[in-house]
């Protein structure tokens, strides 16, 4: 009895110490990590922070290197591991200054989230201590919660397009204002009224890289505090980003609203280090970023700038451009995801979504109580209605009229609940084409400055073609639709250049290229691995953007189409010495030393994106990275 009482006293003392220091109580002996036959970890523990500790340990067992690279990113120390290749990332991290956002907001975050994250970080620290030989370098640990949260803010900003916008500024290709001289996903929700079984169903289908920092990792998390969820997360994630609980499920897809505004500052030589706003010259804030690069004994310094609009970069011509994006203003993304993880019904889930901490993402939802729901969410600002400002291009950075400060609430986003059609879809296409035509929202009722997509892509068009004829949808139908490899009868070109000229070339005029032209014209639009037509189209898909660089929103010319056929001819003869090559011979799924024929293409429902591999082949590097069917 005395031993028991003594043990209880010690336990209570540990608990009190943990709580008084705002640290979670972690009892390693209470944490269970059980892996199924696929290696997926199922983690059980009394508390949420202890589950997060177990998740960190399990994920570190599988991919500790990737997790550590993210930690180094959050410290601006990636170059200490990657060398010069990591230096640009360290500079951008310093430029965006996400840690300042975290420091300003961390005290307003839910204390339960803070404990959860601390539990996760404790798991990583413990794994590192148990396996010191796996630690990349001395800069990885220890890691503070501020470092960690700064990484999450940075990651969301990258998802919002910083990685595409900033290089255009730094290399001088950003659009200049006249007069101022101074890598998709699918999701389908089916209502019980539309399903043959009378169940709600949801397809979660993320198109992400199959390796690296944004490759999905599956886990099942369950605590005695009510957290119970199976789904996917990225390396370094302390919770599920999308998945299913016993009561509800949701999926994310990337939406393409206007998430970043670019401002050209007004400067001149007479006011060095200043920029002009509303007739007033303001000081351009400067910070020196020190970058430590592996192999170089001293740090390299590079200047970062900031204006009232946001992080600012200097072009090679000496012009200054500022970026303003909501993703850099909110450190609460994990808090919203945590609330979504813990929701038990639609009311709680929608309350979580209404926090509006996520700067982007479509959210598709289904539950066991007959509700399906879709919203194209984001952190969208109220922008000036003056039509002289072109929000999808470069804005004048000489007036506060373009400086937005307030954000729209949930009810101003496109959303659907239980449409009569019985289904909702999103394939990174327009939120105004989400269900039956008669029930689709009218884009005229929403702010055009938000930049919502207004088009179908090939995946959404094909999904509609497969769903609309069905009076009811079975579970087998849902899987058949998801794994479909067919392009629609009329191929769409929604992302810029139009390439249907490839199908209009007269093969009789080009005898050498004639077999390729005929094969493409006779192609049934199926991208199975046995198809020769799919191979030709696939090679054209990756070659045409190179020919049309700088001519987006234009049409492929006849001369360019012929040049594309010539490229395909030369490629096949060089690498295979024949033209009747199948897609699967060239396109491969490679894991370790194994290589298999791979069907699919970037804009089919069973999406596959590839990169050059060896001599004359391409291997899958992105696409159907995570699939979950829920009913």
Enumerate the language-model features and the residues they cover.
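Bacterial Sec-dependent N-terminal signal peptides
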Residues: 1-21
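Substrate-recognition/specificity elements adjacent to catalytic centers across diverse enzyme folds
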Residues: 20-213, 220-226, 230-239, 326, ...
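Stable alpha-helical elements in mature extracytoplasmic
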Residues: 98, 102, 113-123, 212, ...
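Acidic, low-complexity N-terminal propeptides/linkers enriched in Ser/Thr/Asp/Gly that mediate export
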Residues: 113-203, 208-210, 368-372, 379-382, ...
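Proteins synthesized as precursors that undergo proteolytic processing into mature forms
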Residues: 335-361, 368, 443-498
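Hydrophobic alpha-helical segments
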Residues: 358-469
């Amino acid at each position: 009895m005395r031993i028991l009482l003594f043990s209880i006293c010690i336990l209570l003392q540990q608990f009190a110490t943990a709580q008084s220091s705002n640290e979670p109580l972690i009892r390693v002996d209470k944490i269970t990590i059980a892996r199924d036959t696929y290696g997926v970890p199922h983690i059980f523990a009394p508390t949420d922070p202890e589950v997060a500790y177990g998740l960190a340990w399990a994920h570190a067992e599988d991919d500790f290197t990737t997790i550590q690279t993210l930690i180094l990113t959050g410290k601006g120390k990636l170059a200490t591991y990657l060398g010069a290749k990591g230096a640009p990332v360290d500079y951008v991290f310093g430029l965006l200054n996400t840690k300042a956002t975290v420091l300003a907001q961390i005290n307003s975050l839910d204390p339960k989230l803070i404990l959860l994250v601390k539990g996760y970080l404790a798991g990583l620290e413990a794994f590192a201590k148990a396996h010191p030989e796996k630690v990349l370098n001395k800069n990885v640990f220890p890691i503070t919660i501020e470092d960690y949260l700064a990484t999450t803010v940075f990651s969301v900003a990258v998802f919002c397009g910083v990685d595409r916008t900033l290089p255009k500024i730094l290399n001088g290709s950003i659009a200049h204002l006249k007069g101022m001289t101074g890598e998709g996903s699918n999701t389908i929700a089916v209502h019980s009224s539309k399903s043959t079984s009378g169940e709600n169903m949801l397809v979660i289908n993320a198109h992400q890289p199959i390796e690296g920092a944004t490759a999905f990792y599956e886990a099942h998390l369950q605590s005695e505090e009510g957290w119970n969820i199976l789904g996917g997360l990225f390396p370094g994630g302390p919770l599920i980003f999308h998945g299913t609980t016993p009561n509800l499920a949701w999926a994310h897809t990337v939406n393409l609203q206007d998430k970043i505004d670019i401002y050209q500052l007004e400067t001149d030589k007479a006011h060095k280090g200043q920029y002009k706003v509303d007739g007033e010259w303001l000081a351009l804030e400067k910070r020196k970023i020190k970058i430590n690069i592996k192999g170089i004994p001293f740090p390299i310094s590079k200047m970062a700038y900031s204006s009232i609009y946001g992080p600012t970069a200097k072009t090679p011509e000496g012009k200054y451009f500022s970026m303003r994006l909501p993703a850099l203003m909110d450190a609460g993304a994990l808090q919203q995801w945590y609330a979504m993880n813990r929701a038990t019904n639609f009311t709680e889930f929608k309350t979580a979504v209404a926090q509006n901490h996520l700067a982007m993402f479509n959210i598709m939802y289904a539950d066991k109580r007959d509700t399906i729901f879709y919203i194209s969410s984001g952190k969208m600002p109220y922008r000036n209605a003056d039509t002289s400002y072109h929000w999808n291009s470069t804005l004048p950075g000489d007036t506060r009229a373009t400086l937005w400060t307030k954000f729209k609430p949930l009810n101003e986003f496109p959303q659907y609940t239980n449409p009569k059609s019985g289904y909702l879809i999103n394939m990174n296409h327009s939120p105004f084409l989400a269900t039956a035509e008669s029930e689709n929202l009218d884009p005229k009722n929403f702010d055009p400055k938000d930049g919502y997509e207004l088009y179908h892509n090939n995946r959404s068009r094909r999904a509609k073609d497969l769903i609309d004829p069905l009076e009811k949808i079975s579970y087998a139908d849902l899987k058949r639709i998801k794994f479909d490899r067919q392009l629609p009868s009329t191929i769409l070109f929604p992302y810029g250049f139009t390439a249907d000229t490839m199908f209009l070339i007269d093969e009789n005029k080009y005898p050498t290229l004639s077999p390729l032209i005929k094969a493409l014209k006779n192609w049934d639009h199926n991208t199975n691995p046995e198809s020769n037509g799919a191979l030709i189209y696939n090679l054209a898909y990756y070659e045409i953007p190179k020919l049309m660089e700088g001519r987006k929103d234009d049409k492929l010319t006849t001369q360019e189409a012929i040049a594309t056929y010539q490229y395909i001819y030369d490629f096949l003869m060089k690498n295979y010495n024949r033209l009747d090559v199948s897609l699967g011979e060239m396109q491969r799924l490679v894991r370790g030393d194994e290589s298999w024929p791979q069907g699919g293409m970037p804009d089919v429902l069973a999406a596959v994106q590839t990169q050059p591999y060896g001599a004359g082949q391409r291997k899958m590097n992105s696409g159907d990275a995570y699939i979950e069917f829920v009913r």
